Design a protein with these regions (language model features):
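Short beta-strand elements that form the blades of beta-propeller/WD-repeat-like
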Residues: 146-173, 212-227, 260-272, 301-312, ...
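Repeated scaffold domains used in trafficking and secretory/extracellular systems
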Residues: 131-144, 196-215, 248-262, 294-307, ...
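Structural motif
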Residues: 170-179, 228-233, 272-279, 314-319, ...
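N-terminal "mature head" segments of proteins
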Residues: 43-213, 328, 518-534
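Solenoidal tandem-repeat scaffolds enriched in leucines and small polar residues
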Residues: 250-378, 386-387
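Blade-level signature of beta-propeller repeat domains, shared across WD40, Kelch, NHL, RCC1
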Residues: 493-534
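A short beta-strand motif characteristic of beta-propeller blades
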Residues: 118-133, 189-202, 241-247, 287-294, ...
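Short loop/turn segments that connect beta-strands within beta-propeller blades
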Residues: 185-187, 236-239, 283-286, 320-324, ...
């Protein structure tokens, strides 16, 4: 295991904090809160108890002359005042975390300590390519859906691997299999393994497979390369058997795929073709696309969970993902986004039909519920806001998702990126800000935009997930498969821990999973508590 798995230790408090920590060990107070280095409020100087202040002349010794009942009453009042001060101080020192449901519907493990244990391990290399030297193998997990992940493999000819390219090539020739495994993330169990080479002729073990788990269609879709063309295979979610397959055209060798829910947007490009050919495919019927067509030069269709938006003849159309029917769409966007809490509304950034650049919220009919002018080139939909950029891309502006009104604007002092964070609880907006060669993670309050914290991070770090009390950043330049994850406190920005893997580490839904350089996957956990995974 890496050397950096020890639990996060807070800085040693100074003398004042140590005194407060010792006093806080009395019953009714959590001493762990005192150890974060916060200093308790110190009483202001004043006359000593029983001393005569300026307003007490002529009444010396009043405390001494009081009756026993009066002294007892004064003591009770003093205790009440002290208790109130402790309560107020405790509230001020207690971090505030978000409440409510997880953004995107995925509850992410709340790992406040470095993951020093594993709840399961699966030898994926042995399941997918037992005859291939492990140094030659690369594993490709899909996005997790309903707690399931499909994992494909390819033989890597990288000469920097422990096995040279010739040895890897020989292994691929000796074992031309192309296997896919379905993994149950909660149980850490391989549900099934299927070798595509049994039904699909000409599969290439060097090809990088792309998988999609589609529980609503009862299928796992796998695209891989064969001799001369691509092939898309539908496997049964229950047992991995082949349900159907379809081959791409040999004259359209380049195929890229975007996925959303049970829909795929497939782009095919021929040599010398000035524009792509597009098809919208439902996972339940690969041979009969819902829609096929082209887009204006310089534009591309944009996929939605229930269809797509395409611009043809300078007119934007929304295509229904079930019927393929088209209807007018009130914007010609460069970017679209949908909130998981309101899938019926499409947020679009781009050119309105009149020519002005706007960000808009459009309903299913394609009519704009609201529209706001913007100079932004990018945006993100967060729990409370549609966040856009402005003023040379250093200011974040929150547009209220309900009506498009400006809720707040905060200048972050540098270029930044904002993304909706899977699993986050609460309305904070997380941004990675770049300035003068340095980067910082900034948390902005969803209420008014004030910066709740700002903490240094790596220039290539990206926010990959969040839980109720933790924000997780991928800490490597390989965005899809980061080699490290760093955890930060969601209320204070304090760094909690960093985990680095010799292979890859990423979130499979709400579970943090590492795949080492031997092809063994492990779910990383804090052995004191693990949150529920969706």
């Amino acid at each position: 295991m890496p050397d950096d798995l020890s639990g996060w230790q807070p800085p040693r408090p100074d003398a004042g904090a140590r005194v407060w920590g010792a006093a806080a060990s009395t019953p009714g107070h959590d001493v762990r809160e005192a150890r974060v280095g916060q200093r308790a409020p110190q009483p202001s100087p004043g006359p000593a108890v029983g001393a005569a202040g300026p307003g007490d002349r002529g009444r010396p010794g009043r405390w001494r002359r009081a009756s026993g009942a009066a002294r007892l009453g004064s003591a009770y009042v003093g205790l009440i005042v002290v208790a109130a001060l402790v309560a107020v101080g405790g509230l001020a020192a207690t971090p505030r975390y978000g409440e409510g449901t997880a953004w995107g519907g995925t509850t992410v493990d709340d790992l406040r300590r470095a993951p020093g244990a594993t709840s399961w391990s699966v030898d994926l290399a042995a399941a997918l390519a037992p005859a291939v030297p492990r140094g030659c193998l690369h594993l490709w997990p899909s996005e997790a859906v309903d707690g399931l992940v499909a994992v494909g493999s390819s033989v890597d000819l990288d000469v920097g691997s422990p096995v040279d390219g010739t040895g890897c090539r020989d292994a691929a020739a000796a074992d031309p299999s192309s296997r896919v495994a379905l993994v149950d993330v909660a149980a850490g169990r391989v549900v099934w393994v299927h070798d595509l080479a049994r039904e699909v002729a000409g599969t290439d073990p060097l090809s990088i497979p792309s998988s999609q788990v589609v529980p609503s269609a009862g299928r796992v879709l796998v695209q891989t390369q064969t001799t001369g063309s691509t092939v898309l295979v539908a496997l049964d979610l229950a047992d991995g058997s082949v349900l159907e397959s379809t081959r791409g055209r040999r004259d359209l060798p380049s195929v890229s795929v975007a996925t959303s829910g049970r829909l795929q947007l497939r782009t095919s490009t021929a040599l010398g073709d000035s524009g792509g050919r597009y098809s919208l495919v439902d996972a339940g019927d690969l041979d009969h696309p819902v829609w096929e067509g082209r887009a204006d030069v310089g534009t591309a269709p944009l996929l939605l969970p229930d269809g797509l938006v395409v611009v043809r003849s300078e007119r934007a159309r929304r295509v229904d993902g079930r019927t393929g029917q088209e209807r007018p769409f009130g914007a010609a966007p460069d970017v679209v986004a949908v909130s998981p809490t309101d899938p019926g509304t499409v947020y679009a950034l781009g050119r309105r039909l009149g020519g002005a650049r706007t960000v808009s919220a459009l309903d299913r009919s394609g009519e704009a519920a609201w529209s706001a002018p913007t100079g932004s080139r990018g945006f993100a939909v967060t729990p409370r806001c549609v966040v856009t950029t402005g003023r040379l891309d250093t200011a974040a502006t929150c547009l209220d998702r309900r009506d498009g009104s400006t809720a707040w604007t905060t200048d972050l002092g540098g270029a930044f990126s904002v993304e909706a964070v899977p699993g986050q609880v609460g309305d904070d907006v997380y941004a990675v800000v770049q300035r003068d060669g340095d980067a910082a993670l900034a948390a902005l309050s969803g209420d008014d935009g004030h910066v709740r914290f700002r903490t240094p991070v790596g220039q290539l770090d990206t926010v990959v997930a969040a839980s109720r009390t933790v924000v997780y950043l991928g800490t490597d330049d390989a965005r899809s498969f980061p080699r490290g994850v760093t955890a930060f406190d969601a209320a204070t920005g304090a760094e909690l821990w960093t985990y680095r893997s010799p292979g890859t580490v990423s979130f499979w839904g709400g579970a943090l999973v590492s795949i080492d350089d031997r092809g063994v996957a492990r779910r990383l956990v804090d052995d004191t508590a693990v949150g529920r995974t969706s």
